[in-house]
Amino acid sequence: MKLSIRPFVLGIALCTLIGIVAFGLAKIPFFLSLHLSPLILSVLVGMALAPWYKKSGQIGIIGVLWCGKRLLRLGIVLFGFQVTLQSLLGVGVEGFLIALLVVAGIFTLGSYLGVKLLGLDRETSMLIACGSAVCGAAAILALESLSKTPAHKTAIAVGVVVLFGLLSMFLYPLVYEAGFIPLSPLQEGIYTGATLHEVANVIGASANLPKEAQEAAVIVKMIRVILLVPLLLLLSFTILKHREKGSNEVAIPWFALLFLGAILLGSLFFFPSWLRSLLQSGSLFSLTLAMGALGLVSDFSKLQGVGAKALALGAILWGVLLFGGLGLVKLLA
């Protein structure tokens, strides 16, 4: 028993160290200006250390893999306490419909084009599509946990989604300020929340909008986050069909149901602000360590021939979000 505990603790300690470095980097003005969260920085630090970790014989691999799976799911569940059903009423049926169409359309289109047009493998296509459609890296991690995707594919998808999310975050304020898009402030908020990848991207891009528009942006984004639950439930049956013969077990994403349960609990019962803050910190800490673990076990030898195609898929979906999302907002909002 002692022999198994030591590598387990070493692995967790290594991921914790990566997480601490990521939190430290996130406070540096340069990274603050880019709105890069510790979650994103953690996977970058992990990927930078991946060659060394491979040469070291992957010390503490048991603990690292535990962080990449169990701690990941815990972080996703705790993330649900940041969303309340009451807040969703602020954008009405139109906001919900726009979010639903974006999630369904982008995920379906990305999964299809990645395989049929670009020749990407199915897993990478779905990860990029999910991250673009729902909530960036958090959605990719949720799908990775369900589909048991290799770490290097997850790292590729996260990198692509982060890139185009950052581009949008810097582009949108410039476009709004220049008046290139004929939208009302409220429509700008809905458009921002419906089309940007990460929650942090939405907050950054809407910072200069009126308060009402900022709230609309966050609410629409949170609707997309909630839609992750039914998406994962549907995918659990789709993924089953592509598994090897002899496996009849349905991959029910229990963590997705717990995520929904967290949303309901946070909506129906009073949570003091200190407790909500604690749960939010717990979610961020868990996901940051999980991202570090995924970066650490990334196999760069498997990245060849995939990067350009993955970027192409991300670019296509980015364009559809920009122009298709604008059309939806003009038509429905």
Curated annotation (Swiss-Prot):
Name of the protein described by the UniProt record: UPF0324 membrane protein WS2204
Species of provenance: Wolinella succinogenes (strain ATCC 29543 / DSM 1740 / CCUG 13145 / JCM 31913 / LMG 7466 / NCTC 11488 / FDC 602W)
Q: Which UniProt keywords apply?
A: Cell membrane, Membrane, Transmembrane, Transmembrane helix
Entry similarity comment: Belongs to the UPF0324 family.
Which ranges does the record mark as transmembrane?
4-26, 31-53, 59-81, 88-110, 125-147, 154-176, 218-240, 253-275, 310-332
Where, per UniProt, does this protein localize? Cell membrane
List the InterPro entries hit by this protein, alphabetically. Answer: UPF0324_pro
| Family annotation (Pfam families) | Cons_hypoth698
GO CC terms of this entry: plasma membrane
Bilayer topology term: Multi-pass membrane protein
Q: What is the lineage of its organism?
A: Bacteria, Pseudomonadati, Campylobacterota, Epsilonproteobacteria, Campylobacterales
Which PANTHER family has this protein been placed in? Answer: INNER MEMBRANE PROTEIN YEIH-RELATED, UPF0324 INNER MEMBRANE PROTEIN YEIH
Superkingdom assignment: Bacteria
